[in-house]
């Protein structure tokens, strides 16, 4: 077999590989250019103060939606960490349970566990959780100042430094 023939047999492989690389690059560019997903509109009651909480009231600054449930004991360490990172008025605690829950009791249980005051809204929001397809707990959604979802994370998360980095990226978005 001469060299010319051998080189031609690799050509389809090279073309396929180059095509794959270009396809992946195209997907990356499309994803990077995609419009951010807006956090849905909501108007719900803070179970601690009975005041209305809306998405519009959170606009203008970045914020975090923390989804959990009263029975989720493995969620406690995540709330502990995120509470230390996120400024006082920038974190909303949403309850995903369908059945009505005692938000005051939940807040008190969390304060006892954390051994500090939690001055955050505790909001019964199973419909919002369903709309956002929140199935795992805890679930965090980082929302930019314009109301767009910048990132999300499901499951136990206690690395406050990593949370602070994601928070800073959200604030800068």
Task: Tell what function each PLM region has.
Residues 72-76, 140:
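The canonical Cys-X-X-Cys-His
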Residues 116-118, 124-168:
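Thiol/disulfide oxidoreductase modules built on the thioredoxin-like
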Residues 1-45, 173:
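N-terminal targeting signals for export/organelle localization
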Residues 41-63:
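A short beta-strand-turn-helix
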Residues 67-69, 94-96, 145:
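Cofactor-binding loop segments of dinucleotide-utilizing enzymes, especially the Rossmann-like FAD-
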Residues 59-63, 87-92, 118-120, 137, ...:
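Loop/turn elements at helix/coil->beta-strand transitions in domains of secreted/extracellular proteins
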Residues 61-63, 68-71:
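Short pre-active-site segment immediately N-terminal to redox-active cysteine/selenocysteine motifs
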Residues 76-114, 124-131:
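Structural microenvironment flanking redox-active thiols in thiol-disulfide oxidoreductases
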């Amino acid at each position: 077999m001469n060299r010319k023939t051998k080189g031609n047999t690799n050509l389809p492989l090279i073309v396929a590989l180059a095509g794959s690389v270009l396809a992946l690059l195209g997907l990356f560019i499309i994803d990077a250019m995609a419009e951010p997903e807006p956090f849905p509109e909501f108007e719900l009651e803070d179970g601690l103060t009975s005041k209305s909480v809306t998405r519009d009231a959170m606009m203008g600054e970045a914020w975090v939606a923390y989804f959990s449930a009263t029975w989720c004991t493995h969620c406690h360490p995540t709330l502990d960490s995120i509470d230390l990172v996120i400024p006082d008025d920038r974190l909303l605690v949403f309850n995903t349970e369908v059945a009505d829950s005692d938000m005051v009791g939940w807040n008190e249980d969390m304060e006892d566990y954390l051994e500090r005051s939690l001055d955050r809204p505790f909001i019964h929001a199973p419909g919002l959780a369903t709309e956002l397809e929140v199935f795992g707990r805890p679930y965090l959604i980082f929302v930019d100042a314009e109301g767009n979802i910048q990132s999300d994370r499901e499951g136990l998360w206690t690395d406050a430094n990593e949370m602070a980095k994601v928070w800073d990226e959200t604030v800068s978005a």
